[in-house]
């Protein structure tokens, strides 16, 4: 009389026949088809077919950035492959820092706002407090991120300098009032703006630029001759690509002359640059 051997729950099961190996085929359209057989959770043999398409994404970066990526790693990272290692480096989003001048909040305003918020909560009969800036469980006046998020429900104030001798320069709560908005000024908004001419004596007009030129590249090219005040690259509104010309303003005219003499006729991005001083407007 033959007796069957009882199986333990930890013993490997023998299915009798092995699974076929993974098969890979190249398709005419450039994709790959991968066929795999495996056992699912219910113990049944299933066939899995995958179609893989390889996509190459080309990113245009500055030459200096590409050279930095070729640097050899040192220290504890010495000998490892180039690029970002996900085990030691976390890549986050770029945080845009917004600096705003002329906005101040007095202690009296903070106390008034906190008292008003407490009164609203008490009137509703609830102890839930929510910040209007970051939506946290605290008063808006006590928000720790208030300096980062900025003022809530308040328009930005003019950042013009305040003169202590000017009568009417400070309004209620010590806030600055523009000259044309003061009582009895009799001036229209922006009348002095159009009468003031801009000094373009240190501004260069750069032409014959490629359509893929970026403002950072122009700034890196011209900053070696002196301090740059402003860089304007003309772009198409629909495509966002450069129109082929730009304006570079220096703080000093001597720096602009030096840049014009060195870069006029200079080969850059497979094109010959043309640099000349900007002509004043009529």
Curated annotation (Swiss-Prot):
InterPro entries, per database record: eIF3_g, eIF3g_N, eIF3G_RRM, Nucleotide-bd_a/b_plait_sf, RBD_domain_sf, RRM_dom
Location of region: Disordered: 1-27
Transmembrane portions of the chain: none
Entry-linked CDD domains: eIF3G (cd12933), RRM_eIF3G_like (cd12408)
Pfam families (UniProt xref): eIF3g, RRM_1
GO biological process, alphabetically ordered: formation of cytoplasmic translation initiation complex
Every RRM domain range: 202-280
Compartment(s) of residence: Cytoplasm
UniProt family annotation: Belongs to the eIF-3 subunit G family.
Function: RNA-binding component of the eukaryotic translation initiation factor 3 (eIF-3) complex, which is involved in protein synthesis of a specialized repertoire of mRNAs and, together with other initiation factors, stimulates binding of mRNA and methionyl-tRNAi to the 40S ribosome. The eIF-3 complex specifically targets and initiates translation of a subset of mRNAs involved in cell proliferation. This subunit can bind 18S rRNA.
Record protein name field: Eukaryotic translation initiation factor 3 subunit G
Species of provenance: Schizosaccharomyces pombe (strain 972 / ATCC 24843)
């Amino acid at each position: 009389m033959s007796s069957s051997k009882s199986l333990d729950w930890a013993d490997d099961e023998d299915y009798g026949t092995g699974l076929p190996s993974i098969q890979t085929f190249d398709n005419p359209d450039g994709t790959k088809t991968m066929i795999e057989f495996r056992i699912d959770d219910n113990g049944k043999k299933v066939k899995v077919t995958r179609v893989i398409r390889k996509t190459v994404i080309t990113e245009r970066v500055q030459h200096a950035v590409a050279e930095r990526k070729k640097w050899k790693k040192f220290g504890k990272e010495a000998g490892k492959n180039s690029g970002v290692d996900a085990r030691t480096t976390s890549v986050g989003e770029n945080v845009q820092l917004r600096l705003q001048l002329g906005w101040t909040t007095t202690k009296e305003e903070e106390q008034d706002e906190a008292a008003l918020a407490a009164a609203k909560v008490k009137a509703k009969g609830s102890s839930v407090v929510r910040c209007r800036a970051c939506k946290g469980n605290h008063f808006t006046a006590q928000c720790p991120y208030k300096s980062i998020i900025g003022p809530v429900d308040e328009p930005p104030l003019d950042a013009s300098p305040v003169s202590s001798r000017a009568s009417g320069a400070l309004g209620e709560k010590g806030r600055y009032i523009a000259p044309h908005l003061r009582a009895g000024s009799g001036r229209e908004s922006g009348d002095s703006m159009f009468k003031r001419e801009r000094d373009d004596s240190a501004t260069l007009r750069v032409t014959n630029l490629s359509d893929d030129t970026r403002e950072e590249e122009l700034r890196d090219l011209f900053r070696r001759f002196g301090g740059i005040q402003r860089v304007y690259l003309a772009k198409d509104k629909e495509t966002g690509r450069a129109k082929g010309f730009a304006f570079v303003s220096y703080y000093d005219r001597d720096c602009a002359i030096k840049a014009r003499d060195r870069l006029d006729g200079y080969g850059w991005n497979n094109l010959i640059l043309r640099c000349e001083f900007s002509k004043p407007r009529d």
